[in-house]
Each structure stands twice: as C-alpha cells, then as structure tokens.
Curated annotation (Swiss-Prot):
Superkingdom of the organism of origin: Eukaryota
Species per Swiss-Prot/TrEMBL record: Caenorhabditis briggsae
Matching SMART domains: C1 (SM00109), S_TK_X (SM00133), S_TKc (SM00220)
Gene coding for it: let-502
Catalytic activity: L-seryl-[protein] + ATP = O-phospho-L-seryl-[protein] + ADP + H(+); L-threonyl-[protein] + ATP = O-phospho-L-threonyl-[protein] + ADP + H(+)
Subunit comment: Interacts with rho-1.
Cofactor(s) the record lists: Mg(2+)
Residue ranges of domain Protein kinase in the record: 68-330
EC annotation from Swiss-Prot or TrEMBL: 2.7.11.1
Description of activity control: Activated by rho-1 binding.
Cited Gene3D superfamilies: 3.30.60.20, Phosphorylase Kinase, domain 1, Pleckstrin-homology domain (PH domain)/Phosphotyrosine-binding domain (PTB), Transferase(Phosphotransferase) domain 1
Name of the protein: Rho-associated protein kinase let-502
Domain AGC-kinase C-terminal: 331-402
C-alpha cells in the first residue's frame, strides 16, 4: 500500500514530488552549486562531478525553447514577452509567454506565475485559456498556451459598435469563466476587456491569471495591498489598502459591472482625468454612477449594472452565480447558459492562416539583453530553487509514457519533448551463433565507450582553455612587471628631485612580493595541469587498449557471421540434393505406372498396394520439401539481418575510428600546447629572476639616494630657518606702513562713492516718481473717458433694447391676433361647407314621370352612403384643420422662443457691460485713493534710498516679467459625461482616451495673465487672471493626467487661481473620501487621501520617487491642490500650506515644447512670488474680469 501511494504521488502531475519536479530539483541544485567558491568544497565538487553530465543529457532530452520556432511578438509586459510560436515537431501554433527569472526574483511580489501556471494547467473549462507546456532554462520560464487569434475585447470595441445583444452574449461567457475560476478556489482581481481573448470560433476565454489569489476555507482572501486596474477596482479593495482586510469573490462581479457599462457606453463609469478623482468616484459610487441619455440603455441592463456596482453585502453574485444567471438581462430566444458554448458568437474573426496576427497590435521586436543574466554569486543563494516543480506537459511526458507503457505491459522510455525509441535487435542469434544478450551488451558497451571518448575530448578542450587562460595570465603578469619597473624608475627620479617616495617604494615592494606569490601559485597550478595531462594521457592509453579489444571483438563477430554464411551455403546444397532425389523418384513412379498398364488387370491388386506406398512416400517427400523451403526462407531472413548488423557495426567502427583519429590529433595538439606553455613558463621564471635582481639593484641605489637626500634636506632646512627669521622682521615693518596708507585711501574713496551714489539715487528716484505720476494721471484720464463712453453705450443699449422689446411684443400680439382671426374665419368657412354638403346629400329628388318609386331597401342604402361620405369628408376636413392648427402653434412657439433668446442676449450683454462698469469704477476708485500717497512721496524723496520701495507699485518690482506665446488649453474642472475624445490603443492593449486641446494666445506681464482667442485680435479676451489671484503653478505627472500621451506629459503644467465672484458651494467637494480620518492639524488645510502610485510620480516635498510597479511607498495626495508627499513628511510637519481657498479654479495648459513649458512655469512662479509681499502696492485683486473661458469663468 505504501509503495502504491508513493507511485501515485510520483505520477500525479498535481503532486509536489512528481517526476517532473524531481528532475527540476536535481537540475536546480546542479546549476546553483556550480560556482567556483562552492566547488572548492569536496562534497559539492563530488556532487557536481557525478550529476553534471547527467543533468546536461536530461536537459537535452527535455522540452526547451529551441523546440519552438518564434514567429512574432504579440505582447509585452513588466516581466517578459508573449511570442507567437510554432512547434517544430507537430507544426502547431501556440502563444508562448517568456518570463525573466532575474526580474521576478528582484521583485517582492513576483510569485504570481505559480497561480497562473496551476490555473491554466488544471482548469477543466472551455472558458479558460489552456496551458499546453511549461518548462524552464537557467534564465527564463516558458508557458506555452493555446493561441487565441481573435485578439482581445478591447480590439473588438475599437473596431465595432457594440450593441446590447453583443454585450449580453459576452457577459454571459465571462460569467461562466469566472464561475469556473471561483470553483477552483481563486479570485481573479483584474477582470477587464484586456484579459478577455477571442478564440478562432468567436467565443471568449479568460486569461492573465497573474493577479489571482487563493481563497481560504471560508471563501475569502486576506490582503493589505490594492491589486487591479484603477478603473475596475472595487471600493472595498480600495478602502482597505495599507492594512489587512478580507474580501471575497464579489470583487470580480464589481469588475463585470464596469465591463457591461463600458461595452454599452464606451467608457468606464467612474473615469476621471486624475487618478485621485477616479478613486473618489469609486468610493462615492452611490451618487457618481450615472447613465447618459445616449446611447439608450434598457431597464434590465441598468438594473444589472446597478446591482453589480453596489455595496459588497448587497452585490449581485455574492451568494452564488445562479443569482446572475437568473437575472432578466440574460433572457433571450437564441441561447441559454446550457447551450451557450454551442451558440453562434456575434463576431467570428476572419483569419488568413493559422498564424494570422491581424487582430493584434504591431509590437517592436527587442534584442535579448544578455546582461540580465544572474550575476556570478560569491556564495550559495539558490536562484533556481523558487522555480522547482514549474515544468508541466499536457500532451506527453515521462509520467504519461510510463502510464501508457504500464497499460500495455511494456514500459517504453520517453522524454518530454524527444521520446527515445529503442530499436530492438533484428536477429535473435540463432543464425549467427551470437546470443541476443551478448549482442546487446556489445552495442551498449560501444555506446558507453563513445560517450567516454566524448567526455575525454571535452576534458582535453577544457584543459586547452585553461592553458590559454594561463597564457593570458602570464602576459598580464609580464606587462605588470614592466609597469612596476617603469614605476621604480619614475620613483628613483622623484627621489633625486627630493620627493617623498618611501611609501611608493614600499607599495611597489608589496606588489612585487604579491606578484611573486601569484607567480608561485601559477606554477603550482601549471604543475597540477601537467599532472592532469599525464593522467589524461594514461586514460587515453587505456581507452586505446579498450578500443583495440573492441576491434578484436568486432572481428570475432565478423568471423561468426562468416561461419553462419558457410552453414547457410551447406544447407542450400542439401536442399538442391533433395530436389534432385525428388525428381528421380517421380520418374520411377511414372515408369511403374506405365508397366502396370501393360501388365493389365492381373497385376492391378499388386499395383494398388504399390500405389499406396508411393503415395505415402510422395506425401513424405512433399513435407520434406516444404520444410526445406521454410528453412531456406528463415536462412534468407537471418542472412539479411546479419548483413544489416554487419553494416551497422561497420558504421559504428568507422565512427569510432574517426573519433579515435580526432582524439589522437587533439592529444598531439595538447602535447604541443603543453610544451609551448612549459617554454613560456621557463621564460617567465627567467624574467622573474632578472626582475628580482633588477629590483635589488634599485633598492640599493634608492638607499644611497635617500642618505644623500637626507643630508641635503638638513642643510636646506637650516638655511630656510635663518632666511625666514630675517624676512619676518622686514615684513612686519612694511605691513604696518602699508596698512596705514590703505586705510586712509579707503576712507577717502568710500566718502566719494557714497556721495556719488546718493546723488544718483536722488536723481533716479525723482525721475521715477515724476514719470509714475504722469503715467497715472494719463491712465486716470483715459479711465474716466472710457467710463463715460461705456456708460453712454450702456444707456443706448438699454434704450435700444427697451424699444426693440416693446416693438417685438406689439408685433407678436398683432400677429397672434391676426392668426386667431384667420383661424376663426377658416373654421367658420369649413363648417359652412360641411353643413351645405350634408344638406345637399340629405335632400331627396322628386320622381320623374315613368320612374318607379324608391324602395325601402334602396332608401336605406342611400342613407348609408350619405352617412359614410359625411364621415369620410368630415375626417379629412378635421385632419387638415388639425395640421393647420399645429403649424400655426409651432410658428407661434418659434416666434416666442426667438423673442426670448433675443431678450436673454440683450440681458447678457447688459450684465457684461454692468460688470465692466463696476470693474472700471473699482479701478478708478483705487487710483483716486492711491494718488495722495504717490503725491506724498515727492516731499520725502531726498531722504529715501533706492532700496526702499514700499510706496512703489508691484509692477515696478517685477516689470521684467514679460512672456507671450501659443498654449493649448483644457479645463480640469469641467464636468462632462461625453467628452470629445480620440480612442487609441496602447502596447499593453489598454483602451485610452486622448483629449483634444484648443490653441490660445497667452500674454503674461506685470499685471495679469491673459488668454486670447487669437494673436491678431487681442480684444477677444477668453480669461484674465490678475496678479493677486494667481495661487499656484506646477508641472503635472502621469498620476494627474493618466490618459495623456507620454510625449505630451513633459509639456503640460497646472495653474490654480482664486475666483471670488463664483459661488463657493459650486466648487466644494461633493464627498469626503479621505481614508485617514479624523484630519490632523498638521495637514495645513490639505484634504489628503492615501494612494498607491504605480506610474512614475515624485514627491513635491523631497523630490524622491513615490511610485513602484509592485509595492509603492505610502503616499498622500491632496484632493484640492494635488500636492503629493511621502507619509513621513506629514508627521514631520515639513509640508507646505494648501493653496486651495474654496474659491480656487484650475487650468491645465500645454506648451509646444518641454523648454517652453519650463519657461512658462519659471515666469509664473516669479509672477506669484512678486505679487505676494507688496504691502502698499496697487491692489488689483478686487478688479476681477468675469469673462467666460473654456471651462471656467474667472
């Protein structure tokens, strides 16, 4: 029983100790232990020596990447690529995913491939992509899956208008796929159209199980990170990121609801430009879920979407999948869930061949990066251990070969991708005299000898490589010795010049000693190689003797074959003699019959007995003849088999002889190389001795030079001390006199410079104040004149509007009265005509002479005709009257709407003029209030320096701020369910929305930031942001604008400004979705929300990265000003104050180039900083211009 249980675990593909896993284990151990540091240990070296060749032979027989011919790259991800491949043996087309082991080991959460491999390998469902093979090499993992030539649903959504009927069909299939996945105990967590592939028949299958996680016994998962695509992630997963939480399979049903909405509407239900806004919409899904007016969506579709996109406890499908299958949305007359797999899909992909890739995007082929191999470790690190047990085969493997062989009572050897077929001997030894067992032993021994020769050849080649390495080391050592000699010469020269070279000489001595030690090590290694070469030579002699024995054995086999042929010839001669005897017996029988006929009836009785005897003899000879014929056929077969064996043995002998000659040549070459190495080594030894003598000479000369140098240095120090003592005395006297002269000179220069600067400052200040007063007087006069002109225009517009409205009302009343009169006259006329007609029809004509009287039946018939005619005529007249009435009412409605539009237009113009007048009045009042202050400056101009600018307006302090140009504008605060978008497809198969940008001409000066519609028409202002209203400017990141082209992102910047004229409640947040509650005082007015960034994003506080593909750092983002920071900065209190005031508005602008964007951001920051500190400067914040712009009304 125990043996049966062990055998069952060995052949079970789901068992962790099956045969494939054991082969993976021994391969991984050999690869991880085969490093120089570990091979110094005797036990590891013995292990590698025993199993290295076995592992290499097993790897050559198992499935590998070269068994598939790569056709095209059809997908690329973070860990690897997906290739379209064709199996070289069966010509079947597959999709092969190739994953890099090194990348997966570096990532913390990279064990996703186990779930993906197990689900696809063991899923028994037609709705899940099937795994055919899984194998590995030291660098990569390979998963060979069935090819889905129809592409994904994203490609279908971009190519066709998806109807509700199509949505129903594809939703039913994805429900079946998720039901199968949940029954296996897994949750997908990333259900989206990108992971739904279309098969050759048009049905879809679920794929990409890298995000799957195993449920526990309660059907839930405990996780602390939010995994999935932002647009499809459920609120319970998003709410609990950063802390452990439990959720079940209902998270997949949420994604199905988003998928149905996207199929019907064309975009996801909670989409927003910024990632934080998307998360906010998901968290507040009760109010943010809305259905557009176009396209029309049925009540059943809306109901199932609402039930999917609901709270987790109430979500459809939480209890079981039958709740979903029984929903009214899936009711139709074409298919049911039982017949779904046999139903006709809406679209069957058109394919030109089995490897057609027209439904996939073109992906650029990359060269493989050889630098991504595992670095050579310094100790055992087990790089291959995490991948033990990954190998799998759905078609054939050693396990299935064993099972199939056991069922047929004959175990056949097989390997995963190259099954070995053992050819049975063609003879059984009866004809040649060689026993079958002995013949098989000869063949096996020949194969083993061949393998030993090959291994010997490999060892010789490795020895040759090591000899070349020794040669290289010798050359490097020679060059190093030459360098040391040159360095010694240089140091000697430096000694003569007085440089301190003791340290250098010591270092050279140490290096020379190290080189001697290294040379000794090389000599020892060379001696080891000599011993190994001698050992290899001895092995070669043994192998030669064994080869000679094999030749003798082969000759013996040939001699036995010759004897067999001679025996066959003798049997053939015996057969010919039997044929001759048979012919003679036939002639004797014929003669006896003739004699019997001549003798007559007398001898008939005797003849009968003779005939019976002859018949028995004839039967006996016929049997002997048949037996001889069979023997001859068997001998023929044996001879043919012996000839075949002879040719096979001859071929093997020829191969062995050729290998032997090659081995002899290699051995000769190796001997010559060894002699060359010995000669080179002698040269190196001689050179080393010469260098040692040279170094000793140099050391002696260095010691002599050191003694001479020390004497010189002592004398030089004495003379230097005497000269320094005298120099110090003279220098002190000279410095005192020089300092006195310089002090006097500096005092006089300072007084002169101060006098000149004061005069210049006084003159410049006087000119600036006079110029400022003149300019403001001129501006005040222009403002007053403009104000009067605008007031006159306003009065004229009011009068004109009043007159036009009065005239229009009178005209409308008159027109309505005329139309009513016409309607009454027409009704009276029609009524009179109808009455006249009825009267004429109702009249009865008098009888003429000769006419018969009208019968009662004819009278009834006539009355019926009159009634029918009257009804028909009345109906037509009433219909025409109704149509005419509707036409008149429609005309009156249009006239009334035109009058209302004109009234609204006039009122809008009047409102704009009123606002402009109020603005001008405010500015005029400010100038009037400021005029006395400027006038008072003139009285104290002689007491002020150039740096005291409290009374000068802000425009002077930053008058060099001037920039203009074309920018593309898009408003972030504009809400629209159907934005103007262009759909594109990225390399990761994601449907992306790229917004259209509108070009405007923008001017920034010392007063305001103004946006115009055109460069030539500067009077058409779109938006004006004045100096005090500008709050914040920054560059955007991919987290702010997710669906923007990567090339456009560096050219975009974000502006925040105040809008006091707008209602603050309109800008308030409709929901508070901050996960970290309650708010802390250290947030500095920010409304933070904790997020995880998977795209490239940086901290606004320290500038370091916030993002990571798998496990990003904890981060916060303000929902108002989009300030991003690390979590620890909030605790440290280093964050800046939020610039959002509750009345702030936002703009997103894009420059033509990255440099243009940087220039605008730099100038705007100067503009903001310059407008803040002015205490007595001209305040322009109150004079807001409420001019409508694209998406804003600043």
């Amino acid at each position: 029983m125990e043996q049966d249980e062990l055998l069952h675990q060995l052949v079970d593909p789901k068992s962790p100790i099956n045969i494939e896993s054991l082969l993976d284990t021994i391969t991984a151990l050999v690869n991880d232990c085969k490093i120089p540091v570990l091979m110094r240990m005797k036990s590891v070296d013995n292990f590698i020596s025993r199993y290295e060749r076995i592992v290499e032979s097993v790897a050559a027989l198992r499935m590998k990447a070269t068994d598939f011919r790569q056709l095209k790259v059809i997908g690329r991800g973070a860990f690897g690529e997906v290739h379209l491949v064709r199996h070289t043996r069966t010509n079947t087309v597959y999709a092969m995913k190739m994953l890099n082991k090194d990348d997966m080991i570096k990532r913390a959460d990279s064990a996703f491939f186990w779930e993906e491999r197990d689900i696809m390998a063991h899923a028994n469902s037609e709705w899940i992509v099937r795994l055919q093979y899984a194998f590995q090499d030291p660098r990569h993992l390979y998963m060979v899956m069935e090819y889905m030539p129809g592409g994904d649903l994203v490609n279908l959504m971009t190519s066709y208008e998806v109807s509700e009927k199509w949505t129903r069909f594809y939703t039913a299939e994805i429900v079946e796929a998720l039901a199968a996945l949940h029954n296996m105990g897994y949750i997908h967590r990333d259900v989206k159209p990108d992971n739904m592939l279309i098969s050759r028949s048009g049905h879809i299958k679920l794929a990409d199980f890298g995000t799957c996680v195993k449920m526990n016994s309660n059907g839930v998962v405990r996780c602390s990170t939010a995994v999935g695509t932002p647009d499809y992630i459920s609120p319970e997963v998003l709410r609990n990121q950063g802390k452990d939480s439990e959720f079940g399979k209902e998270v997949d049903w949420w994604s199905v609801g988003v998928f149905i909405y996207e199929m019907l509407v064309g975009e996801t239900p909670f989409y927003a430009e910024a990632l934080v806004s998307t998360y906010a919409n998901i968290m507040n899904h009760q109010t943010s879920l809305r259905f557009p007016d176009e396209p029309l969506i049925s009540t059943q579709a809306k109901d199932i979407i609402k039930k999917f996109l609901s709270a987790a406890p109430e979500r459809l499908g939480k209890n079981n999948v039958d709740e979903i299958r029984n929903h009214k949305f899936f009711k139709n007359d074409e298919w049911t869930f039982e017949t779904l797999k046999d139903a006709t899909p809406p679209i069957v992909p058109s394919l030109k061949s089995d490897d057609d890739t027209t439904h996939f995007e073109e992906i650029e082929t990359r060269d493989r990066d050889n630098a991504s191999d595992f670095q050579l470790p310094k100790t055992f690190n087990g790089n291959q251990l995490p991948f033990i047990g990954f190998t799998y085969s759905n078609e054939y493997s050693p396990v299935k070969k064993l099972l199939n062989g056991a069922s047929s009572n004959g175990v056949q050897n097989g390997v995963e991708n190259k099954p070995v077929v053992v050819q049975q001997p063609l003879t059984n030894g009866h004809s040649t005299g060689i026993p079958e067992e002995q013949y098989e032993e000869v063949v096996i021994e020949l194969d083993s000898k061949k393998r030993e020769l090959e291994s010997l050849k490999d060892s010789i080649s490795r020895t040759e490589i090591r000899a070349k390495l020794i040669e290289t080391e010798k050359n490097s050592l020679s060059s190093k010795i030459n360098d040391l000699e040159r360095e010694l010469k240089d140091n000697k020269e430096r000694l003569r010049l007085g440089a301190d070279s003791d340290t250098k000489v010591n270092e050279l001595s140490v290096e020379l000693r190290m080189s001697k030690e290294y040379n000794g090590e090389m000599e020892n290694e060379l001696s080891k190689f000599r011993d190994k070469c001698e050992q290899l030579k001895e092995d070669l002699r043994k192998k030669s003797g064994e080869l000679a024995q094999e030749k003798n054995e082969t000759q013996r086999v040939l001699q036995q074959k010759k004897n067999a042929e001679e025996a066959f010839a003798e049997i053939k001669r015996d057969h010919e003699m039997l044929q001759t005897r048979e012919a003679e017996k036939s002639l004797q029988l014929k003669k006896a019959l003739d004699e019997r006929k001549e003798n007559g009836a007398y001898q008939q009785s005797v003849a009968k007995a003779t005939d019976a005897e002859w018949e028995r003899k004839m039967q006996y000879y016929e049997k002997q003849l048949e037996q001889a014929t069979d023997d001859r056929k068997r001998e023929e077969q044996k001879r043919t088999a012996a000839e075949f064996d002879q040719s096979r043995v001859a071929r093997k002998l020829a191969g062995i002889e050729a290998n032997y000659e090659l081995l002899q040549n290699d051995y000769t070459n190796m001997k010559e190389a060894r002699k060359d190495l010995e000669r080179d080594l002698q040269d190196v030894i001689a050179e080393k001795r010469r260098l040692e003598i040279r170094v000793e000479q140099l050391m002696d000369s260095r010691n002599t030079d050191e003694r001479v140098l020390n004497l010189c240095q002592e004398e030089l120090l004495e003379s230097q001390e005497e000269a320094k003592y005298k120099e110090d005395g003279l220098r002190g006297k000279i410095d005192g006199i020089r300092n006195e002269l310089e002090n006097e000179k500096m005092k006089s220069q300072t007084l002169e410079e101060n006098l000149i600067v004061a005069d210049k400052e006084r003159g410049m200040l006087k000119m600036e104040v006079q110029e400022l007063m003149q300019r403001h007087k001129w501006e005040m006069a222009n403002k007053e004149q403009n104000l009067k002109h605008i007031e006159n225009q306003l009065e004229e517009l009011k009068e004109h509007s009043r007159i036009e409205s009065t005239e229009q009302e009178s005209n409308d009343k008159k027109t309505i009265a005329d139309l009513n009169k016409k309607l009454e006259l027409e009704k009276a006329h029609k009524k009179a005509v109808i009455n006249k007609l009825e009267e004429e029809m109702a009249k009865r004509q008098p009888l003429k002479k000769g006419d018969k009287g009208i019968t009662k039946s004819a009278l009834i018939k006539k009355e019926r005709e009159i009634v029918g005619f009257k009804k028909c005529r009345t109906g037509r007249i009433l219909m025409s009257l109704q149509q005419e009435n509707q036409h008149l009412q429609q005309k009156m409605t249009e006239m009334y709407m035109d009058s209302e539009k004109q009234g609204e237009h006039f009122s809008y113009q009047m409102q704009e003029m009123s606002q402009l007048i109020e603005t001008l009045r405010d500015e005029l009042k400010e100038y009037k209030d400021e005029y006395p202050q400027r006038h008072s400056v003139n009285r104290y101009e002689d007491k002020r320096s150039l740096d005291s600018r409290e009374g000068i307006p802000t425009s002077i302090s930053h008058q060099n701020i001037q920039i203009d140009g074309w920018l593309s504008l898009r408003d972030m605060t504009k809400k629209s369910r159907k934005p103007k978008v262009v759909f594109k497809k990225k390399s990761d198969h994601q449907l992306t929305l790229f917004f259209q940008w509108t070009n405007y001409f923008v001017i920034l000066n010392e007063y305001a930031f103004t946006i115009y519609t055109d460069e030539k028409h500067l009077n058409s202002v779109v938006l004006t942001i004045e100096a005090g209203a500008m709050a914040h400017v920054r560059h955007v990141t991919s987290a702010d604008l997710r669906n923007v082209d990567d090339n456009q992102l560096p050219k975009i910047f974000h502006i925040m400004y105040d809008d006091t004229s707008s209602n603050s409640s309109r800008h308030a947040s409709n929901s508070d979705l901050s996960i970290c509650e309650p708010r802390e005082e250290g947030w500095k007015r920010h409304d933070f929300q904790e997020l995880s960034y998977h795209t490239r994003t940086y901290c606004d506080d320290c500038g370091k990265k916030l993002s990571d593909f798998i496990r990003p750092t904890p981060a916060f983002e303000c929902k108002n000003c989009h300030y991003k920071t690390h979590k620890e900065h909030i605790a440290q209190g280093t964050i800046t104050m939020c610039r959002y005031t509750g009345l702030s508005r936002e703009l997103v602008l894009m420059g033509t180039h990255k440099e243009v964007c940087n220039q605008w951001v730099s100038q705007l920051r100067r503009f903001i900083e310059a407008s803040r500190p002015a205490n007595v400067s001209v305040s322009r914040v109150s004079s807001r211009r409420h001019v409508g712009g694209p998406g804003s009304s600043a």
